[in-house]
Amino acid sequence: PRLADAQFDTADDDDDSLEQRIIRFAELSCQKWNGLRQNSNVVSRTALLKALLIAADVAGSALTADGQRPAEWIPRELSARITPELLMPIISKGTKGKEPLPFQRAVGASDKPTTIVIAGCGNGKTTAAYLWAQRHATGRKLWFTYPTTGTASAGYQGYLYDHPDLLSTLMHGRSEVDLQAMQGTAEDDRDDEPLRLESLRAWGKQAIVCTVDTVLGLLQNQRRPLFSFPAIAAGAFVFDEIHSYDARLFGSLLRFLQMFPGVRVLLMSASIPPSRMKVLRELLGDRAGDEIRGDEQMEGHQRYQFEPRDSAESCRMDVTAALAAGMKVLWVCNTVGDAIQTARDAKQWSGVASERIIVYHSRFRYRDRVKRQKQVIAEFEYYTDGEKKGQRVKPGPSLVISTQVCEMSLDISADLMLTAECPLPALVQRLGRLNRYATDDDPWPCLVYPFQGDPYNEKAEWVQTRGDYRASMGAARAAVRELAGQPCSQRDLAERLDGMVDTEQFETFSAWLDDGWLTEASQLRGGDTGITLIREDDLDEIERELGPESSKPSKWTSRLLVPWTIPMLYRRGFQPMRQAGGYPVAARGSVAYSVEEGATWRTNTN
């Protein structure tokens, strides 16, 4: 739309002010876009132009301020691409110097633009992904995406962190804290580095390990991927654990695949529900071949045995017996409140010292959660070579009581598992933490007790606001009931997943594509009434640790405050006392906290 040249007053209260003219221009632009959006070519080209203009602005302003010449810096950085030779040490490390497994070779040999891999634990999916990248990421930048910050950091540390020649980086909102933990030192330079400068680093990397938000956030106009767009446009992509995406995030994945049909993509998971596989097949057509399944022999090992129980309390005798025998026990609850209460009760009846009982969930300060995750992994660690191969590094009993966070962030193998009822895909993921390294038929017990309620709504009247888990919860109960008392394998569970009837609906709105010229960001993941906050109780500690240069609240940035952030369920009536670095500050005493149990609202249950 066009407006004629005119003189006007800049006073905001004038009917013909600059503000009013901007409003009218925006209204006319929206009207024009409503007509243009019917043309798919206009939609895609507008989105590309929007991303390129934003990225160019970021590069131009940041590089000029830094004394760089954009015309020289940009092509030099974007020319950093993967070569097959760079990935050889990573693959050799993953295979321990041996030949890749047949499953891994099959993934590496896939010649389709999009490859779908469905394989359980122990198959070496990550190593298979780097074999795939040798073929499909050569001449491109490799984006290896994970669903959470924890899994992204673990993936980076386990495979790329110490690679001497590969230009790589870890990108997510909390990556600096995790990188400091890997280095074992704190960062001395506390000057704030704007998000745009952080995003520019990806332009010059050959491999980027990140949360899926760093890539798919592009579909919702989120800043980090918009600033990184030239590097994304040069990418090949691995999307791991796609079963964990909620309906909105999975919808953005669908729009990404639709928008970029020529991009090389690897989709991986231990399980993909039929409803998701169906829509992927319809979208991809011949761009994807048959899904590649895990090793047939490995997935056929009888490694689990369901033991239904009437209640959580009826599991206690099994737990005390296992702990008395020096076993490692993993107990998975569906809510943080249940996990904390279960741990408190276990200190009274378990028969082990309280320090052998560890609570692990999402509601810790981020720095404490990182430490807690390392502690849990250390409790279950095995020697991988030498005379002690196959023995626990830390012998003796342990009881880890966790929530859904264990489904992806913990590469551990428990001797006994207990779990509340949960959707079948989640149950399959939880079982990946039990008898993980089985090499033959040797079923270990998984005790399952009843559960109803949030976060797995099964009431029809609440489907619109709380989701619909009726089919997946019913499928899980049927699997436990019908397989109870008999050995079962990953293949048995995969067959039940394939037969699960699910009517899941995906949200495919994209602010980047559908909103045309607008750049307002939209939510990438489904809302869970969550809020990430800082406690007023921690402000004194923050001032001390940040030091004199950054101790003033006016200098606090979101990046500096990440170690003290806590994700909480939103409590009705919550009013932050103020903001710090963009985070709401909860009034002193309103959020109880301990490094052993994490955070809870003082007046409400979680």
For each feature predicted by the language model, list its residue ranges.
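N-terminal accessory nucleic-acid engagement/regulatory domains that precede
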Residues: 1-86, 586
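Conserved Walker A/P-loop ATP-binding site and its immediately adjacent core
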Residues: 140-162, 172-176, 272-277, 336
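Interdomain hinge/linker at the junction between the two RecA-like core domains of SF2 helicases
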Residues: 273-323
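C-terminal helicase lobe and adjacent C-terminal extensions/tails of nucleic-acid helicase motors
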Residues: 341-348, 352-379, 384, 388, ...
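Inter-Walker segment of RecA-like/P-loop motor cores
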Residues: 164-221
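Walker A/P-loop
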Residues: 111-132
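Post-DEXD/H (motif II) to motif III coupling segment of the RecA-like Helicase ATP-binding lobe
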Residues: 226-239, 243-295
